[in-house]
Amino acid sequence: MLEEPECGAPGARGEAAAMDCKDRPAFPVKKLIQARLPFKRLNLVPKEKIDDGLDDTGGSRAGPVQTQLHNLETSLDHLENCHMGSDIDFRPKLVNGKGPLDNFLRSQVETSIGQAVVIIDLTEDSSNPPDNMVGHNKLNSAASSAQKNINGVPDKAGDDRGLPKARQKDELASPEEALSEVPCKTEAGGADSGGADRRGLTQRGSPQNCPKLTGDLSMWSEKDRDGWSEAGGILFKGKMPVVVLQDILALRPPARSPPATPPSQAVPSESETPESSPEEDLALSHSSLSSSSPTSSPEGQSVPTKLHTGPSPFPASTPVCRITKKLVRGSAEKNKMKLQRDKERLRRQLKLRAEKEEKEKLREEAKRAKEEARKKREEEKELKEKERREKREKDEKEKAEKQRLKEERRKERQEALEAKLEEKRKKEEEKRLREEEKRIKAEKAEITRFFQKPKTPQAPKTLAGSCGKFAPFEIKEHMVLAPRCRTAFDQDLCDQLDQLLQQQSSEFSFLQDLKSRRPLRSGPTVVSNRNTDLSNSDVVIVESSKVDGVPERRKFGRMKLLQFSENHRPAYWGTWNKKTTVIRPRDPWAQDRDLLDYEVDSDEEWEEEEPGESLSHSEGDDDDDVGEDEDEDDGFFVPHGYLSEDEGVTEECADPENHKVRQKLKAKEWDEFLAKGKRFRILQPVKIGCIWAADKDGGADLKVLQQFTACLLETVPPEEEQTPKASKREKRDQQILAQLLPLLHGNVNGSKVIIREFQECCRRGLLSRDAGSPEDSAASPPSPGPARPQTPTASEDVAVPSKARLKRIISENSVYEKRPDFRMCWYVHPQVLKSFAQEHLPVPCQWSYVTAVPSATREDSGSVPAPGPGQGMPVSLKRKSAGSMCITQFMKKRRHDGQVGTGDLDDFQADTEEEDDDEGDCVIMDISDVGDIQAPCGTTSGAGGSVGMDTSESFVSPSSLRLS
């Protein structure tokens, strides 16, 4: 890039001025050309990118490129000012280091004033030098046209090239504008205040101050512009920017002499010149970089030099800046070195930028690769998880399918097996039923062979015709259908009815007609035998039911079942021939007190019988008495399950098929039992003669009779009936509760033990009506043997309460729980104790038991004495209904003082071995003489009579003594 020498005017590179401007003669003396070395464009990148790179790498270059370009134009403008306004004495003495050589140069410049300025474009190749003046004229014309555009003269060529004014206004000021704004005169104070101006803040002035710069410019012709172009104030030849140099010696100085320049503003020495070189080179490098971009902003555009091709209006002299060859050569070398340094710096910056971009690119690529790898891993993981899930679902489905198929096969096999078993079972059942029917028929024939029944004539069966939607009605023997119309049809009545329907008279009252009418009457339906076939033509007569084969059924009537679901007592199945006149269909809830006693609750008096012992021990017994008579008697035994269907017991399962199967199984078991040879023993009468008191050999007979000893309860006089019969039950409950309180309160045993103990005490007469506990008279309870029982009565008060009644009284008046006083035991309610004045009862209770209690409970109570040797284990003498017993059926017996020896009882036989349970059904009484009434039982009376019981003629078996 070429640049004209600068003078000492204020500017960005004002310190680097190494020349002094002087007035020269009008004639040209010598051509003086200052040029810079050609440069090579380093990078053809847009201006914005170069500026950004420079701003990033070189932080010290704070000034914009536009300011440097303005400074360059300002320096050129100052140079022109120096040409026009310099006023220096041309004396041979040294002024600022200038001597006679300067005068010689001045004289050479004056002689060559009329010569044209030669323009050398160092940016072009060395093979194309400007050897003629055509290029010079063209450049001058271009420069003049650019200057005219700046000063307001319209540029036709610019308009023809399509550069609108609006674009020129929008852009920043071009280099020509910067040159026009610089004032032509330099002031002395410009150097002092040039600090800010040299950094880019240039002084501005009107373009009229420099008429020489604007008036001598000329326009290029269109024909001379081949290969040249202008964009943004920069000249291009082809694609290369061109800098136009002006001959600084051809310009005439102005008429007036310039003010004296102080020595500080003169041409600097060689030592000062290198200091200004970096800024100058920096500005040049910036302008060189920005000149390659035609579309860059005006800040980075290179500044073309103003050219003056016309003759100078001042012919007298031309200002000349003296530049020594040494200074020019040193400046060129320094500029070259600076240019190289700039290139190296720019290369390093570009390299650093490229490395940074490469690193950033590598980092982005690494990050992208990492993200892609992560996504790929996630996709692979999801794919694997999906495959695993699908595989697991598939396995589960296969497993479920296999299980289903296996279950289906198992069900098929099970169904096939069940079908086979069912078929086999049906065959066996059919076979067994046939055998059962045969056996039952044989038994019935055996039973009913003694009773010959007259054969009743069988009613004829008539089959009725079709009766439409209704099925045929089955009619049995001695049954006829009622006639459809019992009265004869009267035509007069029919006509009267039709007349009334047609008239619809409101005077006639149907209510009055109903009151006046008499109901029709008709006798029983009697159908003659001759009309039987006609009237019963649509009736099917089935076979009459068979008459029950049970004898004397007609005499006693039909069997009846009385059963209630809330009762514990089994249902009643039997005959009921009593009739009442109180209970009628119109009054079904009436009470016939003459027939029934509504105060007695038979359900409470009922007691469950103890389960019998097993008969398995009698399997090995030898039966020597089995003979032909047993075979004959077997026919009279009713088989198990026979005539027991729906009798007395409510079946849990209402399925009739299961019920029949159950009955068949029971019958089969009964058949097997009979097939094994098991037979019931026939009861043999036992004859026991008189037993004398002195007879010691009668111990066995005495022991047998002693089992039926009667125990008489205390006779209680009946209370006066002041309350109705409805309160008798409540009074009895209160009496039982008063006697039960000492045993119940604080007792650790269960309700069964308490009930058994209380019943035993009641049987022995140990409980008095007035006494609340048996401690008063039964501190050591006597055994039932030596005690003299009192004669019982048939009153309800002396009867032994039932288990259900005692259990209800216990549950209503006490609770079994654990309290702080004692552990788990029975506690009577406080209000009950208070009502009976028994709050002082101890816990645990201090009752003396007469029955056996569990060992653990006996130890826990701590107050139960061990039974003495004379007391022994009491024999259970339970009675089911003592009030209904007849004591006259028992006979008197007497015992002596000695102990009865054990004898052989093999000759006494019974149907079962439940003697302990059934021996309470009978009572043996000791009836002494009149004089021995007060004597205890078992002592020898003074009369010494012999008392015996003769059972040879009339034997009373234990079964006959059973009371129900």
UniProtKB/Swiss-Prot annotation:
InterPro entries the UniProt entry points to: CAF-1_p150_acidic, CAF1-p150_C2, CAF1_p150_N, CAF1A_DD
Biased composition (Basic and acidic residues): 156-172, 331-437
Domain of life from the UniProt record: Eukaryota
Low complexity: compositionally biased ranges: 284-298, 770-780
Acidic residues: compositionally biased ranges: 601-612, 620-635, 904-920
Motif (PxVxL motif): 236-249
Gene Ontology CC: CAF-1 complex; nucleus
Modified residues (Phosphothreonine): T723
Record-level GO BP terms: DNA repair; DNA replication; DNA replication-dependent chromatin assembly; nucleosome assembly
Localization terms from the record: Nucleus
Name this protein carries in UniProt: Chromatin assembly factor 1 subunit A
This protein's record includes keyword DNA repair: yes
Residue span of region Binds to PCNA: 1-49
Positions bearing Phosphoserine: S126, S141, S144, S312, S773, S783, S811, S876, S881, S959
Region named Necessary for homodimerization and competence for chromatin assembly: 644-680
UniProt entry tagged with the keyword Zinc: no
Keywords (A to Z) from UniProt: Cell cycle, Chaperone, Chromatin regulator, Coiled coil, DNA damage, DNA repair, DNA replication, Isopeptide bond, Nucleus, Phosphoprotein, Ubl conjugation
Sequence segments annotated as region (Disordered): 146-232, 253-437, 601-641, 769-799, 859-878, 897-920, 933-964
Coiled-coil residue spans: 329-453
Cross-link (Glycyl lysine isopeptide (Lys-Gly) (interchain with G-Cter in SUMO2)): K185
Binds to CBX1 chromo shadow domain as annotated region, ranges: 1-316
Compositional bias annotation for Polar residues: 949-964
Subunit structure, interactors included: Homodimer. Part of the CAF-1 complex that contains RBBP4, CHAF1B and CHAF1A. CHAF1A binds directly to CHAF1B. Only minor amounts of RBBP4 are complexed with CHAF1A and CHAF1B in G1 phase. Interacts with PCNA; the interaction is direct. Interacts (via the PxVxL motif) with CBX5; the interaction is direct. Interacts with MBD1. Interacts with histones H3.1, H3.2 and H3.1t.
Family classification: Belongs to the CHAF1A family.
Domain notes: Contains one Pro-Xaa-Val-Xaa-Leu (PxVxL) motif, which is required for interaction with chromoshadow domains. This motif requires additional residues -7, -6, +4 and +5 of the central Val which contact the chromoshadow domain.
